[in-house]
């Protein structure tokens, strides 16, 4: 049975197609269906994949729990997918939660005491763990024990509980916000990088097969090169292009259909959308190309500072459209040319395309 796609939204307040975070619970369910189950199926992140393959094989050979794993990098690159793959390859169950959900020590203790031998506990947004919960986690990671306080007041006493050996997989987009004691307790640390166009085209082709969509190699590449180096965005664009092709192109996604669909969706050949162009135009037209502080920029375009720093900027910086300097944000020569303008003398040169054409 083919995986059902979500509907094409034309609401003005619809989430950005090129946003790296999941847009809706429905999208998350589609992502789960498209997710590779084993390392052999996992595309890209060659260094992290090869390391995990060795570490998992060694742990299985010794019948031990895999060492604790920290996965960090921009959103949408496959941290959750890798956590599921680790559990699958180890032949164990995975419990999933997130840092903000674990408000009290008891929340974490309940999860830890229910883990079976060598199970995987996946904590997304681990940088958002509260300090009191983090303190409970330290002895669990080091000694597979937790201290529970029973009773209240003068009669309260601490009881030490033994845990089954387990693997913590932590995921974060903000590795710098992790405390040093927590970071030091991870034996395996992997940074996930933006994907190149070839790997994304492979992912798009695989996903199209699961979605029962007819796509040519050229059509897959056209979708991939606008996906901002991010598999989640590639799969989202694929679903929208698939909708267009079914209505306007006889169901076949070739270069022409992909180009027409993405033009309709206002995603340009470089993967920039309206929000990206709005930010770049503000720097160029309102602040003469910069430098401009992020707070001033946020006010100029009506966005939150965190949205600019976490969602919009990473791609623009990696792709050579924006420079972050001590004095503020500056547009590069690539930005001026992209907007059809002549770069002023002394403007910043581009750092180039890091994802591959």
UniProtKB/Swiss-Prot annotation:
The keyword Electron transport does not apply. DNA binds at residues 305, 324, 329. It is an enzyme of class 3 (hydrolase). Residues 269-357 are annotated as: Head domain (RuvB-H). Residues 1-10 have a biased composition (Polar residues). Residues 1-30 are annotated as: Disordered. Its EC number is 3.6.4.-. It catalyses: ATP + H2O = ADP + phosphate + H(+). InterPro entries: AAA+_ATPase (IPR003593), AAA_lid_4 (IPR041445), DNA_helicase_Holl-junc_RuvB (IPR004605), P-loop_NTPase (IPR027417), RuvB-like_N (IPR008824), RuvB_C (IPR008823), WH-like_DNA-bd_sf (IPR036388), WH_DNA-bd_sf (IPR036390). Gene3D superfamilies: 1.10.8.60, P-loop containing nucleotide triphosphate hydrolases, Winged helix-like DNA-binding domain superfamily/Winged helix DNA-binding domain. Belongs to the RuvB family. Has 3 domains, the large (RuvB-L) and small ATPase (RuvB-S) domains and the C-terminal head (RuvB-H) domain. The head domain binds DNA, while the ATPase domains jointly bind ATP, ADP or are empty depending on the state of the subunit in the translocation cycle. During a single DNA translocation step the structure of each domain remains the same, but their relative positions change. This is Holliday junction branch migration complex subunit RuvB. It comes from Bordetella avium (strain 197N). The lineage of its organism: Bacteria, Pseudomonadati, Pseudomonadota, Betaproteobacteria, Burkholderiales. The gene is ruvB.
């Amino acid at each position: 049975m083919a995986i059902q796609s979500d509907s094409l939204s034309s609401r003005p307040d619809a989430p950005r197609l090129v946003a790296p975070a999941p847009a809706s619970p429905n999208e998350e369910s589609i992502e789960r269906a498209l997710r590779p189950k084993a390392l052999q199926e996992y595309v890209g992140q060659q260094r992290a994949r090869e390391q995990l393959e060795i570490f998992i094989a060694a742990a299985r050979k010794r019948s031990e729990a895999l060492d604790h794993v920290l996965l960090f990098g921009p959103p949408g690159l496959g941290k959750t997918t890798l956590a599921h793959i680790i559990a699958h390859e180890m032949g164990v169950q995975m419990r999933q939660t997130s840092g903000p959900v674990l408000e009290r020590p008891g929340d974490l203790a309940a999860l830890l005491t229910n883990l079976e031998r060598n199970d995987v506990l996946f904590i997304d947004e681990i940088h958002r763990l509260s300090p009191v919960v983090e303190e409970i986690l330290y002895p669990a990671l080091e000694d597979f024990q937790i201290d529970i306080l029973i009773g209240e007041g003068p009669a309260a006493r601490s009881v030490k509980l033994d845990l089954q050996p387990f693997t913590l997989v932590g995921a974060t987009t903000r590795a710098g916000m992790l405390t040093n004691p927590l970071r030091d307790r991870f034996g395996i640390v992997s940074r996930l990088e933006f994907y190149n166009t070839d790997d994304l085209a492979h992912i798009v082709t695989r996903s199209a097969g699961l979605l029962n969509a007819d796509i040519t190699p050229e059509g897959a590449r056209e979708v991939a090169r606008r996906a901002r180096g991010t598999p989640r965005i590639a799969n989202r664009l694929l679903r929208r292009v698939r909708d267009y092709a079914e209505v306007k192109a006889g169901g076949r996604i070739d270069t022409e259909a992909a180009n027409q669909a993405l033009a309709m969706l206002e995603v340009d050949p470089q993967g920039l959308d309206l929000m990206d162009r709005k930010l770049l135009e503000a720097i160029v037209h309102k602040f003469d190309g910069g430098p401009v502080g992020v707070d001033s920029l946020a006010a100029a375009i009506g966005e939150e500072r965190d949205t600019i720093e976490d969602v919009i900027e990473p791609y623009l910086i990696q792709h050579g459209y924006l420079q972050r300097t001590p004095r503020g944000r500056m547009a590069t020569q690539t930005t001026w040319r992209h907007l059809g303008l002549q770069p002023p003398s002394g403007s910043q040169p581009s750092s180039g395309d890091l994802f591959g054409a």
